């Protein structure tokens, strides 16, 4: 380890990127807040299973892909929330976010535990007022950094900077947690 540390210190400053893990900021991290239950079932039971799924609004026809989520207990507003990348405007060609009080439909099955929501059936309803908003997020892609004499692999990570607004005033960085195994 001593040789690696000396080599690293010769070529890299503390905290330097060795293999670039691109750092990005997304000021348009679209959020949609959901009712707590759908057909009597808490949606928190399958919220995490929605990441990566394509969804659409039952009435609006707006389409999006789910990229992240937060459960109601972690939400500043107390609602289960999906973060989305919108891909298609509505049936009227002007609506570009899901409507308030609209049922959402997944294009593929949602499996959780021993249960399943079949594709093309509603799985959740947006809240009745102010369901759509824009948050912001920062992402670090997979890479390697030189930290405290070690080459440290960092996995892709996303942090929601502001849950429901796009005017953050934060500093984002990596936190190093050292453990002896």
Which residues does each PLM region occupy?
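Subunit-assembly interface segments of extracellular/virion macromolecular structures
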Residues: 1-181
């Amino acid at each position: 380890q001593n040789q690696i540390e000396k080599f690293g210190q010769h070529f890299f400053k503390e905290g330097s990127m060795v293999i670039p893990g691109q750092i990005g900021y997304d000021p348009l991290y679209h959020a949609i807040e959901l009712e707590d239950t759908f057909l009597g079932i808490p949606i928190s039971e399958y919220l995490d299973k929605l990441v990566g799924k394509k969804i659409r609004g039952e009435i609006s026809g707006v389409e999006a892909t789910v990229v992240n989520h937060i459960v109601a207990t972690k939400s500043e507003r107390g609602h289960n929330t999906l973060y989305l990348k919108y891909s298609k405007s509505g049936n009227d060609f002007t609506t570009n976010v899901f409507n308030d009080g609209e049922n959402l439909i997944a294009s593929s099955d949602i499996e959780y535990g021993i249960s399943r929501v079949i594709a093309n059936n509603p799985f959740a309803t947006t809240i009745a007022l102010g369901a759509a908003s824009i948050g912001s997020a920062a992402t670090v892609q997979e890479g390697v950094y030189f930290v405290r004499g070690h080459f440290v692999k960092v996995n892709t990570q996303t942090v929601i900077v502001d849950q429901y607004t796009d005017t953050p005033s934060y500093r984002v960085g990596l936190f190093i947690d050292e453990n002896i195994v």
